[in-house]
């Protein structure tokens, strides 16, 4: 019998060769292809016996063919039922997956907001560094949205006492007057 825990993988049309399809189907239910081969063998033997003129042996192989066809159909139905049961079991396990509680969802949202704040801070610092490197004067370009998010998360960001670094303009930086 096939492994009942294995569920067939569905391939889009045109992506699977006939050899790959045969291998996949053989792994899912090996009794069906074996039954087909046995049925074809019995039919071939009955044709050989008919050519030899042995009608009793031909009838024996024709009856064997009918029996083997019946066994192949039984294997086909049993394999289909096993695959259906495995698919239902996999769907049931997926439905019973642990769900996140409200507290876990809030914690994940808080972590995401904190990460976004750190990202905005890093982008701000990077923009200042790039502007200084390019010679432009950048002054406290922090957006109101970033300040609002920092207040919502509870992170205190001191934008007032942040040192301003004027870009070099050819004069000395310490002479502001």
From Swiss-Prot:
* Region called Disordered, residue ranges: 150-177
How this chain assembles, per its entry, is: Associates with the respiratory chain complex III/complex IV supercomplex.
Coiled coil regions in record:
83-129
On the tree of life, the source organism's domain of life is Eukaryota
Give an example GO cellular component term for this record. Answer: mitochondrial membrane
Q: Which GO terms describe its biological process?
A: mitochondrial respirasome assembly
Source organism per entry reads: Coprinopsis cinerea (strain Okayama-7 / 130 / ATCC MYA-4618 / FGSC 9003)
This one is known as: Respiratory supercomplex factor 1, mitochondrial
Briefly, what is this protein's role? Cytochrome c oxidase subunit which plays a role in assembly of respiratory supercomplexes.
Question: Which InterPro entries does the entry mention?
Answer: Hypoxia_induced_domain, RCF1
Residue ranges crossing the lipid bilayer per the database entry: 31-48, 61-83
